[in-house]
């Protein structure tokens, strides 16, 4: 009887436990429905329920409330440029849709940077929500993806302006750059983030985008769009965010893969692991937990115990409840970027792949960097920095050079992002360098303008430049010549012109073409190593192309004697060399100017003086008579071997190449006094005494210095030398006339012979092809003849009447 009573009691207990389990299922099911996640996972405890309530809700409104909300919302049309831009993004990036998440997280990070910066001077800025995070949640059941940040948020006006008009988005420039990239066949995905239009990439995967935002200075609003138009309305739920923005994407059918946790996690790690704020993903994991055993299981286990001594000891101790280990699936926010800021870690602990991944993350580039340097500067100011040289030059690198801010150096103070809008963080010529600078010595609670004038920034700038030049210097020669110089060579030349304190360092980075090799470029160090034994100058020749420079009459004797000549073929090259007075103790010599001299023996000197005396009549005649108003003086040349003559500038005058450049600039800006002055400077006319034309001219001048033919020949030689020396002729028509006159004389044609007049053309008779047309013409002629006869008869009668 007693056994039956015990058995009945056990049944009651089992039934009660079953009811409790069913109740727990119902409670957990409600929580799951609220979160929009799968019902297949194990149930969660009360602590997790509280965390789930912090998860992002879709609307908190039923279907009828949502419909009413949309009916009352204010409708807006996108600007035409924004509409065009969205279509361009969707059409050009459809194969790289995943970048939408990178852009949304990047925008969230920017919003967090802004509120953190505001909080430095406004202690109430974080009152609505002190947490600075990005949270991502997938809702498979409702086909929704949420991205929430606790950043600065947007007011109603900002929602309209930032997400619907061109004023804030940089759309116009983006469209131009996008078109250029497509024409060049280059990747366009990195352009999205660079021009602040990354938000619109959400439409790559979403049919509809809903933005809920709360700014400290406004109530919470909802922005909604299907890419055709957008609407904005006050959120009837009130302030559910505290502060920040939630972007909800209603995903397209083919984009359902972005609701998979593994996909989202991989994308966050791929693109955003170096974001400076924690990124959480609402995800599940399996945990092993201890649960109390039921009484029947516990009793069974006790019976299986065979150790009597253990049993005795257990009886003596206070009996503990029996437990068992079970696996349970729980949901929680999982941190995806728990990596310490890479620049705060010792460089020895950072792998090469980590640097590359960080570069791509913060620069929004798709290629690996060409070079990088990670260092800690100590002394007057302490800071940590990582600097990168990109593989290719940014688009528009020299557009409005010096007037546009550089966005490539990000300044942090005590890990707090301050700005990327400093004009003087790096010199203009290093505007391609990207990186971060983090200092503990700069003040936090001051304005950007005040910080920009801080004396420590000048110290930081100086060290950044030195480290950048060290980084560039370490690039391997082959990679430097083939890649770096092609992309950034002009920047180095501008640095020589602008940066006096680092001119010597920059000079070692210069590369030019030279006569040493038909295609390879050379450094100045290599040139100096190859100089002839008694050569004391570095020779260079400037021209619009290598072909023009190496065919110039100025390099004839130099090349024949085995001297190497550097060819300057870019407009900035001659400015660069002028700013560099010497290199390694060797001065530069422009071979198109006065001052080119060669070592000569005593006998050579005597021969030269004898030749000068022999040609003195011709030289004086040219200077005082034939070319009186055109040249400063005429001399026997030491640099010509094949050409009859050349026009040489003074040491302070302009070469032909420089004059051409300056005149082109003058036409754009309007001529100034200095341009006119240098352009009007007379030059030295050098003649080649061994050339047959010059020798014959000497003979003719000795015979008759008033011979007009010889005078014309002298002027033609001067004008030809002007062109061959790289200068422009002021009167090309007169030059053409003189050439024609010389040709007439060479062909024994009378200089005054006129051009034959063209004969007058007689009107052509038209012949009709068809018989019908001919007959019609005959009829018309007969009618016309009859009319003429009648007219003559009438005129005759009138005349007779007049006589009577």
Swiss-Prot record:
It is an enzyme of class 3 (hydrolase). Glycans are attached at residues 62, 107, 217, 445, 481, 502. Keywords: Acetylation, ATP-binding, Calcium, Chaperone, Disulfide bond, Endoplasmic reticulum, Glycoprotein, Hydrolase, Hydroxylation, Nucleotide-binding, Phosphoprotein, Sarcoplasmic reticulum, Signal. The modification Phosphoserine is found at residues 64, 172, 306, 403, 447. The modification N6-acetyllysine is found at residue 479. The record marks 448 as: Important for ATP hydrolysis. One of its GO terms (cellular component) is melanosome. The keyword Glycoprotein applies. ATP binds at residues 107, 149, 162, 199. CDD domains: HATPase_Hsp90-like. Its main location: endoplasmic reticulum. NCBIfam families: PRK05218.1. Homodimer; disulfide-linked. Component of an EIF2 complex at least composed of CELF1/CUGBP1, CALR, CALR3, EIF2S1, EIF2S2, HSP90B1 and HSPA5. Part of a large chaperone multiprotein complex comprising DNAJB11, HSP90B1, HSPA5, HYOU, PDIA2, PDIA4, PDIA6, PPIB, SDF2L1, UGGT1 and very small amounts of ERP29, but not, or at very low levels, CALR nor CANX. Interacts with AIMP1; regulates its retention in the endoplasmic reticulum. Hyperglycosylated form interacts with OS9; promoting its degradation by the endoplasmic reticulum associated degradation (ERAD). Interacts with CNPY3. HAMAP family: HSP90. The SRT pseudosubstrate motif associates with STT3A during translation in normal conditions, preventing glycosylation of facultative sites until HSP90B1 folding is completed. This is Endoplasmin. It comes from Sus scrofa.
């Amino acid at each position: 009887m007693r056994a039956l009573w015990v058995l009945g009691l056990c049944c009651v207990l089992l039934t009660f436990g079953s009811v409790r389990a069913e109740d727990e299922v119902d409670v957990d099911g409600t929580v799951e429905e609220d979160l929009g996640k799968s019902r297949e996972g194990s149930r969660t405890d009360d602590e997790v329920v509280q965390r789930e309530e912090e998860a992002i809700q879709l609307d908190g409104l039923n279907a009828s409330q949502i419909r009413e909300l949309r009916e009352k919302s204010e409708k807006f049309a996108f600007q035409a440029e924004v509409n065009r831009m969205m279509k361009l993004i969707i059409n050009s990036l459809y194969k790289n849709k995943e970048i939408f998440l990178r852009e949304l997280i990047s925008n969230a990070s920017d919003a967090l940077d802004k509120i953190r910066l505001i909080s430095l001077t406004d202690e109430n800025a974080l009152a609505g929500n002190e947490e600075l995070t990005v949270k991502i949640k997938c809702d498979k059941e409702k086909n929704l993806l949420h991205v929430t940040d606790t950043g600065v948020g947007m007011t109603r006006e900002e929602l309209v302006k930032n997400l619907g008009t061109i004023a804030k988005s940089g759309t116009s420039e983006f469209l131009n750059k996008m078109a250029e990239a497509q024409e060049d066949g280059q990747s366009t995905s990195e352009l999205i983030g660079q021009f602040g239009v990354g938000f619109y990439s959400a439409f790559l995967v979403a049919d509809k985008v809903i933005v809920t935002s709360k700014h400290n200075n406004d109530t919470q609003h909802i922005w909604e769009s299907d890419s055709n138009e957008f609407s904005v309305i006050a959120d009837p739920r009130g302030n559910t965010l505290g502060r920040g923005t939630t972007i909800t994407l209603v995903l397209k059918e083919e984009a359902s893969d972005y609701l998979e946790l593994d996909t989202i996690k991989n994308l966050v790690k791929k693109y955003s692991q170096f974001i400076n704020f924690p990124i959480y993903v609402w995800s599940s994991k399996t945990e092993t937990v201890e649960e109390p055993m039921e009484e029947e299981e516990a009793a069974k286990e006790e019976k299986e115990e065979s150790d009597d001594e253990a049993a005795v000891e257990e009886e003596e101790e206070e009996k503990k409840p029996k437990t068992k280990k079970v696996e349970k699936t729980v949901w929680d926010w999982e941190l995806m970027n728990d990596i310490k800021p890479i620049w705060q870690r010792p460089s020895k602990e950072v792998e090469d792949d980590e640097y590359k991944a960080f570069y791509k993350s913060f620069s929004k580039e798709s290629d690996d960097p060409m070079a990088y340097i990670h260092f800690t500067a100590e002394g007057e100011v302490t800071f940590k920095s990582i600097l990168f040289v990109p593989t290719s030059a940014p688009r528009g690198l020299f557009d409005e050079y010096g007037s546009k801010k550089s966005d490539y150096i990000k300044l942090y103070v005590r890990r707090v992002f301050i700005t990327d809008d400093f004009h003087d963080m790096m010199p203009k010529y290093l505007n391609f360098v990207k990186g971060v600078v983090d200092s503990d010595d700069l003040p936090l609670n001051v304005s950007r303008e005040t910080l920009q004038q801080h004396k420590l920034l000048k110290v930081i700038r100086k060290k950044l430049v030195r480290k950048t030049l060290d980084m560039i210097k370490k690039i391997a020669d082959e990679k430097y010549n083939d890649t770096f110089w092609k992309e950034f060579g002009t920047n180095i030349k501008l640095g020589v012109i602008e940066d006096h304190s680092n001119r010597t360092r920059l000079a070692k980075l210069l590369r030019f073409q030279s006569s040493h090799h038909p295609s390879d470029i050379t450094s100045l160090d290599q040139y100096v190593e190859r100089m002839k034994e008694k050569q004391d100058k570095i020779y260079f020749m400037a021209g619009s192309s290598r072909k023009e420079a190496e065919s110039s009459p100025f390099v004839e004797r130099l090349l024949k004697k085995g001297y190497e000549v550097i060819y300057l073929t870019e407009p900035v090259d001659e400015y660069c060399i002028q700013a560099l007075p010497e290199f390694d103790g060797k001065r530069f010599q422009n071979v198109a100017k006065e001052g080119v001299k060669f070592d000569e023996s005593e006998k050579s000197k005597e021969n030269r003086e004898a030749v000068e005396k022999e040609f003195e009549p011709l030289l004086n005649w040219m200077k005082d008579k034939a070319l009186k108003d055109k040249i400063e003086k005429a001399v026997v040349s030491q640099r010509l071997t094949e050409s009859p003559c050349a026009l040489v500038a003074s040491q302070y005058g302009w070469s032909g190449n420089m004059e051409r450049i300056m005149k082109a600039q003058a036409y754009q800006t309007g001529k100034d006094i200095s341009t006119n002055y240098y352009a009007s400077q007379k030059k030295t006319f050098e003649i080649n005494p061994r050339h047959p034309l010059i020798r014959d001219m000497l003979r003719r001048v000795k015979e008759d210095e008033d011979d007009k033919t010889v005078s014309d020949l002298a002027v033609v030689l001067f004008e030809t030398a002007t062109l061959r020396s790289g200068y422009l002729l002021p009167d090309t028509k007169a030059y053409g006339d003189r050439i024609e006159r010389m040709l007439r004389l060479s062909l024994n044609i009378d200089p005054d012979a006129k051009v034959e007049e063209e004969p007058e053309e007689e009107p052509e008779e038209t012949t009709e092809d068809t018989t019908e047309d001919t007959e019609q013409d005959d009829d018309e002629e007969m009618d016309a003849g009859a009319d003429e006869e009648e007219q003559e008869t009438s005129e005759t009668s009138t005349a007779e009447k007049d006589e009577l």
